[in-house]
Curated annotation (Swiss-Prot):
Keyword ATP-binding: yes
Family: Belongs to the PRA-PH family.
Enzyme superclass (EC): hydrolase
Protein name, per record: Phosphoribosyl-ATP pyrophosphatase
Superkingdom field: Bacteria
Gene expressing this chain: hisE
GO biological process assignments: L-histidine biosynthetic process
A cellular-component GO term for this protein: cytoplasm
Subcellular location(s) of the protein: Cytoplasm
Pfam annotation, one family: PRA-PH
Lineage, broadest ranks: Bacteria, Pseudomonadati, Pseudomonadota, Betaproteobacteria, Burkholderiales
């Protein structure tokens, strides 16, 4: 039996998250976030990102790496919720990462700035 890929896992989890749209906010945490709207979804990402930073600092001070893994999992989960909330999917992010693959960060940033100038008529 073959191991599922990271992409398979993300897409499967995204499908579960998508299925919570319009669900009962009393029965599902994700449905509750969707029901509360943009601010609630985005606030959770900020909270989880802060927890990732704190857990990473703890690892540097001898803390458990598993705590960092758990916090990153929470952040990824809430990012998947945000993607779904804005009618996007992990496939959109994966496509963007694949587009950037093999390109230096400096080169990618310069291309992005040039594209933004062109879109803004400058």
């Amino acid at each position: 039996m073959t191991q599922p890929t990271i992409e398979d896992t993300l897409l499967r989890l995204a499908a579960v998250i998508d299925s919570r749209k319009g669900g009962d906010p009393e029965q599902s945490y994700v449905s509750r976030l969707f029901h509360k709207g943009d601010d609630a979804v985005l606030k959770k990402i900020g909270e989880e990102a802060t927890e990732v930073v704190l857990a990473a600092k703890d690892v540097r001070q001898g803390g458990a790496p598993s705590a960092l893994v758990g916090e990153v999992a929470d952040l990824w989960f809430h990012c998947l919720v945000a993607l779904s909330h804005f009618d996007l999917s992990p496939a959109d992010v994966i496509a963007e990462l694949e587009r950037r693959e093999g390109m230096s960060g400096i080169e990618e940033k310069a291309l992005r700035k040039r594209r933004e100038r062109e879109e803004n008529g400058g």
